[in-house]
Amino acid sequence: MSLEPSEHIALRAEVSELERLNRWVERLCEYHELPERVALQLDICLTEVVTNIISYAYPETTRSMSAVAVRFALRRPEVAVEIEDHGVPFDPLAYIPAQPASTLEDSQVGGHGLRLVRKFAGEMRYRRDGSFNRLRLTFALPRH
């Protein structure tokens, strides 16, 4: 399942790295002239997944020494990204998010990010490879 990337970025597992991730995604989307919709979905999904890794994959005491790798590959008619970390095992495909609340008063903050990722990504694949979590997301590109 390993992705042969055309681009990659290594991030420290720190919230401050999200800005660098967002700039990287923006640069790639502009360079490859990806449609605005795909660029927005890609940015939202990567921000959500990497935020979850930063928040939950590593103990707080070792977080600043931990890393997250993101690989990007454009393979028309799709874009693929692979997110890799060596945190605690977590299969987002097995995670069942809570149903959205029916009223604003009943709603809770958090827990909706993976729902967005599932909605926006055309395909999600996860595997645990030794001590690594690997999540691949694909996004369909419109036909010209």
Q: Which positions does each model-derived feature cover?
A:
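Solvent-exposed beta-strand sheet faces enriched in polar/charged residues
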Residues: 12, 71-73, 82-84, 127, ...
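Conserved short strand/loop->alpha-helix "switch" segment adjacent to the catalytic nucleotide/phosphoryl-transfer site
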Residues: 26-47, 106-108
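Conserved polar catalytic motif of the HATPase_c/GHKL fold
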Residues: 48, 52
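Flexible, glycine-/charge-rich segments associated with ATP-binding catalytic modules
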Residues: 1-9, 118-144
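ATP-lid-like helix-loop hinge signature
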Residues: 53-74, 82
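Glycine-rich phosphate-binding loop
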Residues: 105-121
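Glycine-rich/acidic phosphate-handling loop/turn and adjacent ATP-lid/helix
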Residues: 79-109
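Helix-loop-beta hinge of the Bergerat
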Residues: 4-37
